[in-house]
Every structure is written in C-alpha cells, then in structure tokens.
Amino acid sequence: MKQLPILEPGDKPRKAAWYTLTCPGDKPCPRVGHSCSYFPPVGEAEKGKVFIVGGANPNQSFSDVHTMDLGTHRWDTATREGLLPRYEHASFLPSCSPHSIWVFGGADQSGNRNCLQVMNPEARTWSTPEVTGCPPSPRTFHTSSAAIGNHLYVFGGGERGAQPVQDVKLHVFDANTLTWAQPETHGSPPSPRHGHAMVAAGTKLFIHGGLAGDRFFDDLHCIDIGDMSWQKLGPTGTAPVGCAAHAAVAVGHHVYVFGGMTATGALNTMYKYHTEKQHWTILQFDTSLPPGRLDHSMCVIPWPVMSASDTEDSGSVILSLQDEKGDAAEKPETRSGGSREESPTTLLLCFVFGGMNTEGEIYDDCLVTVVD
C-alpha cells in the first residue's frame, strides 16, 4: 500500500485527500479501544490539544494519557494519576466544564466497568466522583461523540465476547448534577448491539451498525432528545455495509463514518451522512486510502493555514470549532480590509488515531482528512 502524504504544520490540505501527521515527542504506543478527544485552548496563545486516553493491546490495558499539542505539534504524556486502565470506553467534555475530560465504562483484563472518572483540569489528576441514580450495567461502549451539552448518552454496548448487553434503555448522565437517569422513550429502540457508532448532531443521536453474535447490522436509528422518540431511518444514497467497531464524528449537518470490520475484514472507506436530507454518500479520495482498521478513535480538530485573499470586496471566512451541544460546527466570521494579504483560515480535519486490522496488526498512526 502506498504511503500517504505527510501534512506539515501550516500546510493547506486538499479536500478528498488523506494525510499522515508525524509529530515528534512521547507518542502513544500502538493500541485499540482508546478514546480520542479535542481539548479546546485554555489561553489565547494555545491552539488546543488532542487527548488519547487508555486503550489496550493483546498484553495489557492502558491507564496512560497522551496529548498532541496543536500549537507545537508535539506529543507529550499527560497525567495518569488515578486513572483506571480501560479500553472501549466512552469519553466526553461537558459544556459545564469544557476543560474536563470524562470517561465511562469500558473494560480491562479483569472485566467490564461502569464507573465514571474525570480529569481535573487544574490538578491534572483523575478522580472517581460519587454519582446518584442507577448507572448502566458494566459494559464496553466505545465512542467520543455521544454527548450533548452536559449529558452523555449511553445505548447498548458489549457484555462478553461478541455478545451485547440485552439492555435497550437509553441511559443519560448529567455531568452538572452527577446523576444517572433512564428517561422514558417512545417508538422502537435499536435491537441489542455493541460496536455500533453513536454520534450526536444537534439535538439528535444517531446509531449506525454494530454487532450481536455473528450478525452485523447496517441499519441507522435516530432519537431526538427533544421528544425522546426513536426512529428507524430509511436514508437514500450509498450507505455503509453492515459493520462494527467503526468510528463517527459530526460536523454541522454531516456525520462522517470511517473504518470498521465486516465478516470479511477491516474497512478503509469513509461515508458522509446528511442529517437533514437523510442521504448517504461514499467519499472518493484522490490519494491512497489508509489501511483498513477497526477499534480506532476519531475527533474533529481545527487546522490553521495561511491563504492569500483580496479583502477589498469580500471578507475572508474564518472557521472555528464550537463545543456547543457536543458538535463540531463551523462558525463564520469576516475580516474586512482594502488589500490583498495573507490571512489566517482554519479548516476542520477529521483526526484518526490507532486501531487494528483483522490480521492482528495494531496501529499507532495519525491520519487526517478535511471535513466540512
């Protein structure tokens, strides 16, 4: 397989192209089942960071945390004090505390977990807060994109081996009140499954695919948290095949799905779903495709570039990531002027780290592609 082009700091990536990021420093070792979160900048001088939390290889579960600084483009280790080893867990950054990373569930070699842990943004240590309400049973639940506002939404997950938990309730954790709840829902929920992609876009949660025993699902379900009604969707276009252990992110009205596994191997395809038009598109790339993979993790990151623009007649559009309602979104601003000049522009990239193929090869690569 051909090598992907390397994206250097300041380079302007093309659409319909995959790139590799090669940042120096203390990089995470090859792993699966980790979480991948974009951490917004704390000060004006910062550009934000990507946090890789936990994960596993065939020999062990990890309790380490690595960060990629998007300003210096270097890897470093972050605090691991207090973090329990886990893989195939969920992570989220609630709007009430956007500089705290929460993790839920997952597993280590001894079994599944259902505890919540949070990284204190100032002390940089992990703690296990006391919560109220009825938590979900211990399970694997691998997502970094199933949160809206202060709430993490949990549906399904892994019980043991290829078997999912039989629970089809929607579990909701409120990071502001430290409370679990199981709200009443309407309609028919998805059948029990694990390894599904679950992603929030606006006020809706989308669930695609997953696995139960030897059955791979290709269905797409949605629940709107406004009315708590489940809906099985019948979208048009070219939809992903039945798969599991894939990853998804949301940008505005689009959901991007990449990778996963089928009964015949690992996938390296990316699909885009338009949430308003209910239409799937398989994306075509001008570059080589990355190696097929499963059990990887993704997030959306900003990528600043310089571009020449004539500001006399029209402003230059600046894009930024918003952490509102758990979505990555585009926020236009304009800058006016009277001459042609180099102006900063921020693109949005889908950032992919790690995973493995079905032959047992585990990855530690960083992949990016433009999303909009």
Swiss-Prot record:
Pfam families: Kelch_KLHDC2_KLHL20_DRC7. Phosphorylated on Ser residues by PIKFYVE. Keywords: Cytoplasm, Endosome, Kelch repeat, Membrane, Phosphoprotein, Repeat. Residues 321-342 are annotated as: Disordered. Residues 322-342 have a biased composition (Basic and acidic residues). It is found in: Cytoplasm; Endosome membrane. Kelch repeats lie at residues 49-95, 100-146, 151-203, 204-250, 254-303, 349-372. InterPro entries: Gal_Oxase/kelch_b-propeller, Kelch-typ_b-propeller, Rab9_kelch_effector. Rab9 effector required for endosome to trans-Golgi network (TGN) transport. Interacts with PIKFYVE; the interaction recruits RABEPK to the endosomal membrane. Interacts with RAB9 in its GTP-bound conformation. This is Rab9 effector protein with kelch motifs. It comes from Rattus norvegicus (Rat).
